[in-house]
Design a protein with these regions (language model features):
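SH3/SH3-like beta-barrel fold
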Residues: 36-42
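Mixed-charge, Lys/Arg-rich low-complexity intrinsically disordered regions
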Residues: 1-16
């Protein structure tokens, strides 16, 4: 089991993996500890999401994959 990710530390450009297997790039972080705004880079369950921007719930973030 992975350690929880502290999303307050994540800035724009950081790539993270989500619970559903998708990968997103953070666009902005309101620093509320609950939400991130991110762009989908991959989405195995719904390829139509790739390129779209959505709010991501903190509990859906499972791993930091890289970034600035």
């Amino acid at each position: 089991m992975n350690e929880p990710v502290n999303i307050r530390l994540l800035g724009p450009g950081t790539r993270v993996a989500l619970l559903d297997g998708a990968t997103v790039e953070i666009v902005s972080n309101p620093l509320d500890g609950v939400w991130l705004f991110a762009r989908y880079l991959t989405s195995p369950d719904d390829p139509a999401r790739v390129g779209s921007e959505e709010m991501i719930f903190a509990q859906d973030v499972v791993e930091i994959q890289g970034g600035p």
